[in-house]
Amino acid sequence: MDCPSCKVSYDEEVFTDNLMVCPHCNCHLRIEPRQRITYLTDENSFQELYPNLKTCNPIEMEGYEEKISAAEEKASLNEAVITGSCKIKGRDALLALMSFHFMGGSMGSVVGEKISRLMLKGATERIPVIIYATSGGARMQEGLFSLMQMAKTSSAAAELDEKGVPLFIMLCDPTTGGVTASFAMLGDITAAEPGALIGFAGPRVIEGTIRQQLPEGFQRAEFQLEKGFVDCIVPRQEQRQFFARMIDAHSLGLKETPKKKKA
């Protein structure tokens, strides 16, 4: 198996044992939600939520059902996000993990619904929410129904904030478009994986628009950290411990009922 960055070859087991991170250049390869669940959560603690929600082709876009079927086969998922409850080093958390292999991680009505439900559950039950974001943006095959999810997920994130329940975001490669312009930038802590592409429009679109070559590293996680767009960069091997610390640091008083704000 070749690293897409440095092109050095290793047995696939080497990549798997290293959480799909290249031992030579530290390139973080794109991985699937169930792989993340294995290294991030306590053994057998993940319980999937809302597994049967599926899109119904709301605007009857021709060929959409075929694209969904092909994506299901490619990603072994029925949508571009998995949501569930879990424990991370004994701490309770609600977890959403997006898949770029399912139609580019595009956010349609079901992705927005599952993420919104998860955040509202976190607000009601006062459980921290962690979202692993990776997406090419809104799902154009669902038209305005897709764009509506930006407001919907942002509203759910605001509910978490109102209830004082922490929302943690991990930006993975790539995170762009409508996901970047909505819930992915609304966390109490916004972290990123090394080298992740993060922005609204991708670099090729920007270069084609302004007809100029962008500087090396533009929109990568390290660039965004330097500009204050993300709070920290967390290597994959450290993410389990990182989220355990974040939950501890931000969860004081979660068992208490928040006081109502005076009108």
From Swiss-Prot:
A zinc finger (C4-type) spans 3-25. Pathway: Lipid metabolism; malonyl-CoA biosynthesis; malonyl-CoA from acetyl-CoA: step 1/1. It is found in: Cytoplasm. Acetyl-CoA carboxylase is a heterohexamer composed of biotin carboxyl carrier protein (AccB), biotin carboxylase (AccC) and two subunits each of ACCase subunit alpha (AccA) and ACCase subunit beta (AccD). The keyword Lipid metabolism applies. Component of the acetyl coenzyme A carboxylase (ACC) complex. Biotin carboxylase (BC) catalyzes the carboxylation of biotin on its carrier protein (BCCP) and then the CO(2) group is transferred by the transcarboxylase to acetyl-CoA to form malonyl-CoA. This is Acetyl-coenzyme A carboxylase carboxyl transferase subunit beta. It catalyses: N(6)-carboxybiotinyl-L-lysyl-[protein] + acetyl-CoA = N(6)-biotinyl-L-lysyl-[protein] + malonyl-CoA. Belongs to the AccD/PCCB family. Gene3D superfamilies: 2-enoyl-CoA Hydratase, Chain A, domain 1. The lineage of its organism: Bacteria, Pseudomonadati, Spirochaetota, Spirochaetia, Spirochaetales. It comes from Treponema denticola (strain ATCC 35405 / DSM 14222 / CIP 103919 / JCM 8153 / KCTC 15104). Its cofactor is Zn(2+).
